[in-house]
Amino acid sequence: MSDGEQRGQIVVRIIRAAMGYAAIPTGFPILLSERMAIIEPAFAWLIELATIPGRSHAAETIRTYGEHLHDWFDSLEQTGLDWRGVSEAEIAAWRNRMLSQPSPHTKRPYARSTVNDRVRTVCRFYAWAQDRGWIESLPFHFVDVRVGSGRRQSFLAHVDGRPGIVAANILTVAEHERLPRPLRVDQLRRVYAHLEMPYRLMAEWGLATGLRRKELCGLAV
């Protein structure tokens, strides 16, 4: 299947671990092949991220990584490719398909930041696989990129010894950052006027402290 062709029916499944298994967190994503066999390398990487002390990630992060790998391994199954034998070209074709076709789940185009997040997750997985001896070489490489002092660097961009130079993943695409527009004072007053306690207090805390949306929603007052 080329990057311009439509995907067929989804063949890889993702299930969530049930309660009662001490070694596997509840809700942990488990990828199953078309033959309903656990995709072992994906399971091994995710379980390591979820359970190793000092390196464990939040459950939501593991869920996101699982969804990214689900899409990648489903693409591999549909094209008949072994995950260990892919090259940069196959990952690029998968990336290009996301850039040119809408999500099969939301029916909306993928944001470029979403595409990059998925590519980076897959590259993290392959970096881990090489470190564990599953593969000999990485199916991607880095290029030197000059960035401004205020530009956000990706998780897979390594700082070079030269000022303003980073090694960027060749498979990621340029993102056009859209900065949020802050509310004016009069707009804030109108918002506060429609909020009762404790929600007004929560809004004031969020404005004063810069709380993230998830942190704000988790407040108990």
What residue spans do the PLM features occupy?
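Basic, Lys/Arg- and aromatic-enriched nucleic-acid-binding interface segment
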Residues: 175-213, 217
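N-terminal core-binding DNA-recognition domain of tyrosine recombinases/integrases
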Residues: 43-61, 69-156, 190, 210
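Basic/aromatic DNA-contact patch characteristic of tyrosine site-specific recombinases
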Residues: 1-57, 63-70, 74
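Intrinsic-disorder/low-complexity loop/linker signature
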Residues: 9, 19, 35-36, 107, ...
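A short, basic/aromatic helix-end/turn motif that makes direct DNA contacts
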Residues: 219-221
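Intrinsically disordered, low-complexity segments enriched in proline/serine/threonine
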Residues: 27, 31, 141, 165, ...
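DNA breakage-rejoining catalytic core of tyrosine-based enzymes
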Residues: 135, 149-189
